[in-house]
Design a protein with these regions (language model features):
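N-terminal mature ectodomain segment of secretory-pathway/periplasmic proteins
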Residues: 31-101, 135-136, 141-143
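Intrinsically disordered, low-complexity segments enriched in polar/charged residues with Gly/Pro
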Residues: 50-52, 60-61, 71-73, 78-81, ...
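Bacterial Sec-dependent N-terminal signal peptides
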Residues: 1-23
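Catalytic loop of the DD-peptidase/beta-lactamase superfamily, centered on the K-T-G motif
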Residues: 83-94, 104-111, 223-232
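Flexible, processing/modification-adjacent segments and terminal tails
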Residues: 20-26, 94-166, 189-192
């Protein structure tokens, strides 16, 4: 009996290890599709994102991300209202509603919004490579799901509490491993949060980045808007 239990424990360990390997294989293949030369870690580029929303004027954002230089800049223009946030190493500059410019550090609560923007855009436009970041917990099980009639390999990701609390799912084309959909939930309740449908591709510094992102509510498929990437 002891031998059987020991062998069962060994078999269980092998199965779990195999599942984990499969999940990371899918992620590695997805990264191989989007960033075949490993350029993300040294990414330095500028691009424009036009956000189209129902019944609202478009918001045009010009974004600069320089990972080696630890630099981020976001300038937005919506209906003639212009704002900017800039972070360089530990220094932070941003414009207030009245147009005045504040210079401070990233530890200042006033810069919280600027840090949020930096993390937001670096995360979204750095996927799926960002799923290798510390604090990211990749579920070892690869799910097979249908989404809007198409088959996908789905990876579930959670984060250490210090990183984030949302639960994410990433949908990859089973043939090419291109990332085509992702969604997040605010809790185990899958009616919370949003899903994002990706379409088109743009090559930026050797990285294949989804061109358009259409955002919807999970609860009722309500349409929120579409981010459209523009490369000058």
């Amino acid at each position: 009996m002891k031998i059987i239990i020991t062998n069962f424990a060994l078999l269980f360990s092998i199965v779990i290890s195999g599942q984990e390997l499969i999940a990371y294989q899918v992620l590695d293949k997805a990264i191989g599709y989007h960033d075949p030369k490993g350029n993300w870690s040294r990414f330095a580029g500028e691009f424009q994102v036009v956000l189209e929303m129902p019944d609202k004027p478009n918001r045009v954002s010009r974004i600069t991300i320089d990972l080696p230089g630890d630099y981020f800049n976001l300038s937005t223009d919506q209906d003639g209202k212009i704002n900017f946030s800039e972070i360089k190493n530990n220094q932070c500059r941003f414009s207030k509603e009245d147009g005045t410019v504040v210079t401070t550090t990233v530890n200042d609560l006033q810069c919280e919004r600027g840090v949020l923007f930096k993390n937001y855009y670096t995360y979204l436009y750095g996927l799926p490579m960002k799923l290798k970041d510390p604090g990211t917990n990749l579920d070892p099980l690869v799910q097979h799901k249908k989404f809007k009639g198409n088959d996908f390999l789905v990876l579930k990701v959670t984060y250490d509490e210090t990183v984030g609390t949302d639960i994410w799912q990433f949908y990859f084309n089973p043939d090419t491993y291109a990332m085509e959909v992702y969604q997040f939930f605010k809790s185990s309740d899958e009616s919370t949060g949003e899903y994002i449908v990706l379409s088109g591709e743009v090559l930026v510094n050797g990285i294949t980045i989804p061109k358009d992102r259409a955002w919807y509510f999970n609860k009722d498929n309500g349409y929120l808007g579409t981010d459209k990437l523009v490369i000058n």
